[in-house]
């Protein structure tokens, strides 16, 4: 734990705050990614490829394309680190990228969609973590 704290990227956490509107949009993105995680567990690469074909967000489409080609979590991290487009980003886009990467790692590991959603909403703060519970409860009621 201490080693993880010592090597943490503190510049990311000291950046300017992200607007409520951006966080709301990111919450919707996290919910969409949770649905992709459910498809990935059911249909494997076919579900991921279908999601990649219909995705508009560049950060997510890039990762879904890699997952559809069989990339693992380590390959995803390396691809995002090497891609020059994802280097110098504003705080909102940096938060989006971090959240998407964490969600894609969950999808690559075939984790349960609830776990993936929880991991992603943890980046947005406690109120969104609680909002995720309400979203999941609503989805269960609709089944």
Residue ranges and their predicted role:
Residues 1-143:
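Large intracellular
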């Amino acid at each position: 734990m201490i080693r993880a704290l010592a090597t943490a990227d503190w510049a990311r956490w000291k950046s300017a705050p992200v607007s409520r509107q951006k966080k709301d949009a990111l919450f919707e993105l996290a919910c969409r990614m949770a649905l992709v995680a459910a498809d990935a567990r059911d249909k494997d690469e076919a579900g991921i490829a279908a999601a990649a074909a219909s995705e508009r967000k560049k950060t997510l489409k890039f990762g879904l394309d890699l997952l559809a080609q069989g990339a693992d979590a380590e390959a995803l991290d390396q691809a995002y680190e090497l891609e020059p487009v994802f280097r110098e980003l504003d705080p909102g886009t940096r938060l989006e990228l971090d959240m998407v990467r964490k969600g894609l790692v969950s999808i690559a590991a075939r984790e349960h969609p609830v776990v993936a959603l929880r991991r992603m909403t943890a980046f947005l703060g406690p109120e969104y973590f609680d909002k995720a519970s309400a979203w999941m409860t609503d989805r269960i009621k609709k089944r």
